[in-house]
Curated annotation (Swiss-Prot):
Organism: Campylobacter jejuni subsp. jejuni serotype O:6 (strain 81116 / NCTC 11828)
Catalysis performed (reactions): L-methionyl-[protein] + [thioredoxin]-disulfide + H2O = L-methionyl-(S)-S-oxide-[protein] + [thioredoxin]-dithiol; [thioredoxin]-disulfide + L-methionine + H2O = L-methionine (S)-S-oxide + [thioredoxin]-dithiol
Protein known as: Peptide methionine sulfoxide reductase MsrA
UniProt family annotation: Belongs to the MsrA Met sulfoxide reductase family.
The keyword Kinase is annotated on this UniProt entry: no
NCBIfam families recorded: msrA
């Protein structure tokens, strides 16, 4: 089993996509990259943390390359601290890696993707230093709240787009 931690906008959206993938064992939403012991309120007030999803996966069933490819399909890696209507540093595009092999793979992936994108990719790559699990009510938010307004307006269409190819 391996882990990768990704930030690409609202963590509810990112988690909703990855928790459905074959080979993904578990997902957990949290915060990384800012002040210690964050809360949702402190993150929204700009404490420097990023909304992230920790993805625990079986590399025999799904590769990191496949995960990163999907990650770039579900968010805009050329947008600085903004995804759709969600604006702020907590929504930045970032890949937090745990080992050098994953760092190199992520760097090579972004280099290849830059050949496809007309705008500059701004996704950061950084070693995971600290990770804080988000509050329980954020975990598996779409599964637990499929009829909530944000879920219907933002997450459900994103899932439909991914499922339709």
């Amino acid at each position: 089993m391996k882990n990768i931690v990704l930030g690409g906008g609202c963590f509810w959206c990112v988690e909703a996509v990855f928790e459905r993938l074959k080979g993904v064992i578990d997902t957990e939403v949290g915060y990384s990259g800012g002040n210690p012991n964050p809360s949702y309120e402190s993150v929204c007030n700009g404490d420097g943390n990023i909304e992230v999803v920790k993805i625990n996966y079986d590399e025999k069933q799904i590769s990191l390359l496949e995960i990163l490819t999907l990650f770039f399909k579900i968010h805009d890696p050329t947008s600085i601290d903004k995804q759709g209507g969600d604006i702020g540093i907590q929504y930045r595009s970032i890949i937090f890696y745990e080992n050098e092999e994953d760092k190199i793979l992520a760097q090579n992936f972004i280099e290849e993707q830059q050949k496809i994108f007309s705008k500059k990719i701004v996704t950061k790559i950084s070693r995971l230093q600290t990770y804080y699990k988000a509050e329980n009510y954020h975990q598996h938010y779409f599964i637990n709240n499929p009829n909530q307004g944000y879920c219907q307006a933002v997450i459900a269409p994103k899932l439909q787009k991914i499922q339709s190819g």
